[in-house]
Amino acid sequence: SAHGIVAIGALALCKNTSGDNNTAVGFCSLVCNTSGFSNVAVGVCALLNNSTGQENTAVGFKAGIATTTGCGITAVGMCALHNHTEGGDNNAVGMCSQFSTTTGAGNNSMGHKSMELNISGTSNTAIGEQALRRNTTANDNTAVGKEALCGNTTGTNNVALGHKAGKAITTKTYCCIIIST
């Protein structure tokens, strides 16, 4: 049997069999967890589908809801990392931040809808509302500022600093744009 379990809310951690050191607060939080360990889920349906994932933190309504086997994710905000299934080491802070990320790994996003449409892109950093919003499969981009690189879909190794910096870039690689307003 599992040790170190805290479950508050209807169906919270109800399927847990051997996962140790899990905390679930909220209706259906960590409901599908069976053997995943060291997870924290706070909010209605937070980490709902996690079964064997470990060392994940999800705070907010439906944060990390689709995660099944992912490890080391942090999702803070309503629907942050919503579609995430198995990628690891993603950090998403803000409503709908990395909403569509399924298998991408090593991404860091902060801001409302930052990296919202990312699917499998890896090692990206987006800070600011809608920064890198349309990124789908691109890797190694850094966008800092509201709407920085928000139009980028597949361009890699880009750096954009400032409000709307590189907003029109969609597929270019190795661009560096700095806008000061």
Range-by-range predicted roles:
Residues 1-181:
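Glycine- and small/polar-enriched repetitive beta-structure motifs of secreted/surface proteins
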